[in-house]
Amino acid sequence: MDYNIFEAVHEQQSSTSDMDLSEEDNNPFVGTHHLYASGIGTTIGEARPENENSPPSSSSLPSSPAHSSSAGSSRASTSSSTSSHAVVEADAETEPFVSLSMSTTATISKFTPHDMNGTQQIQIIDAGDFKDPWGKHAIGYVILYENNKIIRRYSEFHSLRQSLTRLLPTIIIPPIPSKHSLLKYIWSPINAANDSKIISTRKKMLNSFLSNCLNIQEISNDIVFQKFLNPEFNWKDVLSSSPIIILPLNNLLAPPLSPTKPSPLHSILPIPSNSSLRNYNSIWQQHITVKSHNEISNLPTEILQNESQFTHIENLFQNYKRIITHLLKNIRSNKSHFHSLSTYFAELGAYYNAFSLENDITMPNSLRESENNSNNPMMEIISHIEKTGHSFDVIYISSEILIEKYTSILEDPINELLQFLNESFKVLNFKKLKFLQFKILERLIIEKETKLSSLTEIENQLQKINESLTRSTILTDENYKDTKAADLTFVKKDVRSLSKSSSNSSSSGHQNEIHIGASKLNYKTSTPTMNLNKLEIKQLTEQERSKQIKQLNQDLSKLKDCLSICISDMLEINNSSYNSLMHTYNHINLTIGKILKLFAASFKAWIKECLKNWKLAKLQIDEAL
């Protein structure tokens, strides 16, 4: 059994379950599905790393049961010496509480670990059942950072990650273990005594989450993340204070690099729907291929040039996701098959050992007490059978270690990389939504400008008509009626032609149309501020037209300011998200190489251990013959 994985659970139960702890420490089958899970005294205390960032070496495999037994004794003593961190009763209730303050501070006298660059590392050193300040039980994780201990619950890790996602929308936030469903909490709530494997897995992944966050400068410098690692801050109070409470509901309504400081214009920006992402490629191609008649459609050259890089990264990540998903399925399948093989080894060892014991029991006492017992053929056969069974036992234990490494070195890191890729796509989608927001503003501006142009043209035409009517008043009284009739005919023709041209100019490529009829031009309405798409221009008075023109100019001014802000946001998103995507790309490449090398070393060590064991058994049998 891997002590490093279940160390926290042993420590939690040491004060109340010393007998059980001692039994588990000497049992290599604990945590397996084998029938004989309580009979062979050994351990794999050095089989796995303390955390995911320091996987085991090939020398960690046990060479003999004696080595395993000594490791078991060492582990038991370590467990008793560290039981002071212990958590209280193991019959703890579950985890589905609201976020509680689990913070505690303690100065650590021992040296805090550092990496090769001298940077102080962060580590989760314990996990188990704790009591909060209100006396409730919860599963807590003890974080060691800067010589302080901070206890945080899983729900607090979850809320931290959600907050970081909103505070840093252009940064890929490292993943954490998935949250269990509410149904599972109802039927089988997490318990420190019964779910030690789940807790230890979360402990490793949360440790990886914190380490990855510290390696990302934007996250490590964030005030919320710093408060999370500060034992003096109550996490519940952090979530109900600035900057969390002043974040916008949607990051598209705030500056991407400083969402807590939006401008007044950010609040009136349009929000494109997520369903519009399906048409992103076609909209982008249309934008760069169709020559726009308006200068507002021109994006900065930097945005146009960077788009090909983002497309390449997205295609690369899609390919990574496809390969990793298939690889993860194969890993789980191979792990299951290898576990079956390990079970066969255990059964073979049990059969050989039982057979040797059976012959030993049925042997007459006279043969046992004989001085020439060493030369007795029956005793030699029993010894050979026992050595063979012992070899199968050792191979079984080594195989169980390798299965655990399948999880710690291969399956869990690969699954984490898959979550990294999913988070990368969210950042890419945020960038796409910002461009779609730009396209909405662009369309609104073009519509407003078209309306303003039509309204201005009509105003100019009506002024010409009024001037023509004014000139007719200087005619003599005798010709006044004829001149008036002629002018009215001219007015009707001019209005009809104007109506056609206005209708054609406003309906081409836009939803709203402007119509002019043959009714009186000075018709007054009871709603002078009614939208132009609901009220025909012919019904507007001169004052109403002037008001509409003024309103359109104001709207256009705001929309153009919004467009400038949107373009500025796009530039910031491109720069920040590109750096984050490249950081993730490098992290994935390095992690995959590290995973393959470590697992190859572990598999090679397992093969060597098996070969060494069989050679030793053969040598002992040959010497006895």
Swiss-Prot record:
Residues 1-90 are annotated as: Disordered. GO terms for molecular function: phosphatidylinositol binding; phosphatidylinositol-3-phosphate binding. Residues 98-235 form the PX domain. Belongs to the sorting nexin family. One of its GO terms (biological process) is macroautophagy. CDD domains: PX_SNX41_42 (cd06867). The keyword DNA damage does not apply. Present with 450 molecules/cell in log phase SD medium. This is Sorting nexin-41. The gene is SNX41. Transmembrane segments: none annotated. It is found in: Prevacuolar compartment; Endosome; Endosome membrane. Binds to SNX4. InterPro entries: PX_dom (IPR001683), PX_dom_sf (IPR036871), PX_Snx41/Atg20 (IPR044106), Sorting_Nexin_Autophagy (IPR051079).
